[in-house]
Amino acid sequence: MVKFLLLALALGVSCAHYQNLEVSPSEVDGKWYSLYIAADNKEKVSEGGPLRAYIKNVECIDECQTLKITFYTKVEGVCQEHTIVGRKGEDGKYITDFSGQNYFHIVEKSDDTMTFHNVNVDDSGKTNVILVVGRGESSSIEQKQRFEKTAEEYDIPKENIEDLVPTDNCDQ
């Protein structure tokens, strides 16, 4: 019995990063900047990739049962603005359509950053994406190290991490 309880505890701790964080409008609403993005399919988040998102604004609606996110992508170097509306499902993940079906949630938050995990499902399969956004236009070494650890937890190789700050010239 003790072995079973220890196993259950170990599994609970190892899967803790998959829990959805509850957020309030005061934590979410406002201007954000994309800092880092990574995916298990790097093509999707590389320069010109369909999931390389430059977040600009997040709005919490109905006590965060809905998130409205305004962001840019680049097609052949040209910025294109998009707005998606994600509705929270029973499992706590937000669901929306953009370049396929997306299931996302906030996995980490602090006063000045939020980290999203997204599963994108399209004709080519399933892609795990993580994205960290900040209130400021730059990040610290500690934020990058924390993001690298989160990427590792989602089995995304460190070499798949993209620094978005140098290429974010949309909405300026």
Swiss-Prot record:
Range of residues in the leader sequence: 1-16
SS bonds (residue pairs): C60-C64, C79-C170
UniProt-annotated location(s): Secreted
This protein's record includes keyword Transport: no
Pfam family, one: Lipocalin
Domain of life: Eukaryota
GO molecular function, one term: odorant binding
Inducing stimuli: Repressed by estrogens, androgens and thyroxine in adults (at protein level). Repression by estrogens and androgens does not occur in immature 20-day old animals. Induced by prolonged light deprivation and starvation (at protein level).
InterPro entries: Calycin, Lipocalin, Lipocalin_CS, Lipocln_cytosolic_FA-bd_dom, OBP-like
Tissue localization of expression: Expressed in the lacrimal gland from where it is secreted into tears (at protein level).
Assigned GO CC terms: extracellular space
Family: Belongs to the calycin superfamily. Lipocalin family.
Keywords linked to the UniProt accession: Disulfide bond, Secreted, Signal
The protein's name in its UniProt record: Female-specific lacrimal gland protein
Species in which this protein is naturally found: Mesocricetus auratus (Golden hamster)
